[in-house]
C-alpha cells in the first residue's frame, strides 16, 4: 500500500517521544488516544497509549479501536500495516462493519481463523495485552460461534485442575486471563482483576498455590489477608509436582503440617513433592507407606520402604521473604530423592 503524505507524517510523528510534541498537534493528527499521546514503533509494530503502557501489537490495537468504533484509528492502523481481518473479532455495529469491509476485510472469519487470531493476540504476555484480551474476548459473541471443545481445550491447558464444569464461557475466559496474569506475575493485570472480581479472591489464592507462585501467595495471605482452610491450601500446593515454593511457604512460614503435605503428595502421586516434604522434616514414613498401599500406589510404597531418609539439615527453615525463598529453591535438588535414585540404580526395588 502506498501511503499518503499525511499518513507518513502521522507515522513519523507517532514515532517521536511525546514530550517533544505538543498535545494540540497530536490531537490534530489523530495521535491522541485514551486521553494521552499515542506512540507507534514501526519496527516492533507496537502501539503505546495511556492504557497500553507496555505496548500492544498493532493488530491488537486495531481490535480495540474497532471495539470502540474509533473510525479514524481503524483507518490509520490499517494504513500502518494492521491486518484488517482482525477487525472481525470485535466489530459490533453495522457502520463499523461497512468501514472494515471498505478497507478490505473479509465478510466473515472461519472458525479456524477465529481461533488462530485468538491465539496470536494472546501471545504477548504483558499486562496491557492481557487486559485488552479480557475486555475484547471475555464477553464476545464471536467465541460462542466456534467449536466449544477446541476453545475449552485451550482454556484447560492454562487452568488444568482449576477449570470448573461451567457452561458460562465468559466466566471461564475471565479466569483464563486472570490465570495468565498470575502465572507470569503481570502486576498491573493482577491488580486490574483483583479490583474488579472480588468473588475470585479465593480462586486466585488456589491458583497461586497450584502454580507455585509464592510471591502472589504471600501478597494474598500476608498483605490482603485472604484466607481459606489450611488443609485445603496444602492440597492445592501439593496437587502439582515440584511445587517446592508454595509447599515451603505453607509449612514453614504458615505452620501447616509437613506430614500432612507429604500425605497429600502421595495421594496425588507427586513423588517430587513427597521427597521435598521429607527434606523439610516430614517423618511419618510408615504412615505414608500404609497410605500408598491403601491407594494402590505400590511404587511409592516401595520408595518409602528404604530406611535411610532424613531431614536436609542444609536447607534453611527460617526464611519468610518470598523472594529469598525463590532464590534458595531455584535450582533445588531433593536430598532424599537423590538417595532413592542411587538405591534404585544399585539395588532396584523388586526385593523390597
UniProtKB/Swiss-Prot annotation:
* The organism of origin for this protein: African swine fever virus (isolate Warthog/Namibia/Wart80/1980) (ASFV)
Q: Which InterPro entries match?
A: ASFV_MGF360
Q: Which Gene Ontology BP terms does the record give?
A: symbiont-mediated suppression of host innate immune response; symbiont-mediated suppression of host JAK-STAT cascade via inhibition of STAT1 activity; symbiont-mediated suppression of host JAK-STAT cascade via inhibition of STAT2 activity; symbiont-mediated suppression of host type I interferon-mediated signaling pathway; taxis
UniProt entry keywords in alphabetical sequence: Early protein, Host cytoplasm, Host-virus interaction, Inhibition of host innate immune response by virus, Inhibition of host interferon signaling pathway by virus, Inhibition of host STAT1 by virus, Inhibition of host STAT2 by virus, Interferon antiviral system evasion, Viral immunoevasion
Q: Please report what switches on or represses expression of this protein.
A: Expressed in the early phase of the viral replicative cycle.
Q: Name one Pfam family in it.
A: ASFV_360
**Record function comment:** Plays a role in virus cell tropism, and may be required for efficient virus replication in macrophages.
Which GO cellular component term is one of those annotated?
Answer: host cell cytoplasm
Q: Could you identify this protein by its name?
A: Protein MGF 360-9L
Q: How does it assemble?
A: Interacts with host STAT1; this interaction mediates STAT1 degradation through apoptosis. Interacts with host STAT2; this interaction mediates STAT2 degradation through the proteasome.
Q: Where in the cell is it found?
A: Host cytoplasm
Keyword field contains S-adenosyl-L-methionine: no
Cysteines engaged in disulfide bonds, as pairs: none
Concerning its family, UniProt says: Belongs to the asfivirus MGF 360 family.
Name the source's superkingdom.
Viruses
Q: What residue ranges are annotated as transmembrane?
A: none
Amino acid at each position: 500500500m502506498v501511503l499518503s503524505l499525511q499518513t507518513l507524517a502521522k507515522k513519523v510523528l507517532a514515532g517521536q517521544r511525546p514530550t517533544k510534541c505538543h498535545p494540540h498537534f497530536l490531537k490534530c493528527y489523530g495521535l491522541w488516544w485514551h486521553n494521552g499521546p499515542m506512540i507507534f514503533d514501526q519496527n516492533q509494530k507496537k502501539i503505546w497509549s495511556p492504557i497500553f503502557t507496555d505496548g500492544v501489537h498493532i493488530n491488537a490495537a486495531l481490535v480495540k479501536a474497532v471495539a470502540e468504533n474509533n473510525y479514524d484509528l481503524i483507518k490509520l492502523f490499517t494504513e500502518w500495516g494492521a491486518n484488517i481481518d482482525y477487525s472481525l473479532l470485535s466489530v459490533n455495529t453495522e457502520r463499523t462493519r461497512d468501514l472494515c469491509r471498505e478497507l478490505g476485510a473479509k465478510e466473515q472469519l472461519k472458525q479456524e481463523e477465529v481461533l488462530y487470531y485468538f491465539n496470536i493476540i494472546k501471545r504477548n504476555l504483558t499486562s496491557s495485552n492481557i487486559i485488552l484480551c479480557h475486555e475484547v474476548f471475555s464477553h464476545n459473541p464471536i467465541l460462542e460461534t466456534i467449536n466449544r471443545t477446541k476453545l475449552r481445550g485451550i482454556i484447560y491447558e492454562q487452568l488444568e485442575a482449576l477449570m470448573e464444569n461451567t457452561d458460562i464461557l465468559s466466566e471461564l475466559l475471565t479466569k483464563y486471563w486472570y490465570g495468565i496474569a498470575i502465572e507470569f506475575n503481570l502486576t498491573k493485570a493482577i491488580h486490574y482483576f483483583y479490583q474488579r472480581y472480588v468473588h475470585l479472591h479465593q480462586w486466585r489464592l488456589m491458583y497461586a498455590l497450584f502454580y507455585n507462585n509464592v510471591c502472589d501467595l504471600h501478597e494474598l495471605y500476608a498483605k490482603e489477608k485472604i484466607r481459606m482452610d489450611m488443609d485445603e491450601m496444602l492440597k492445592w500446593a501439593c496437587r502439582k509436582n515440584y511445587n517446592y515454593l508454595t509447599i515451603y511457604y505453607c509449612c514453614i512460614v504458615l505452620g501447616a503440617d509437613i506430614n500432612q503435605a507429604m500425605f497429600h503428595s502421595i495421594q496425588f502421586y507427586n513423588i517430587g513433592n513427597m521427597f521435598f516434604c521429607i527434606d523439610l522434616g516430614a517423618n511419618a514414613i510408615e504412615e505414608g507407606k500404609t497410605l500408598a498401599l491403601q491407594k494402590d500406589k505400590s511404587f511409592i510404597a516401595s520408595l518409602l520402604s528404604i530406611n535411610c531418609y532424613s531431614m536436609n539439615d542444609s536447607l534453611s527453615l527460617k526464611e519468610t521473604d518470598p523472594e529469598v525463598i525463590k532464590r534458595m529453591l531455584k535450582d533445588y535438588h531433593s536430598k532424599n530423592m537423590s538417595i532413592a535414585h542411587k538405591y534404585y540404580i544399585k539395588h532396584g526395588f523388586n526385593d523390597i
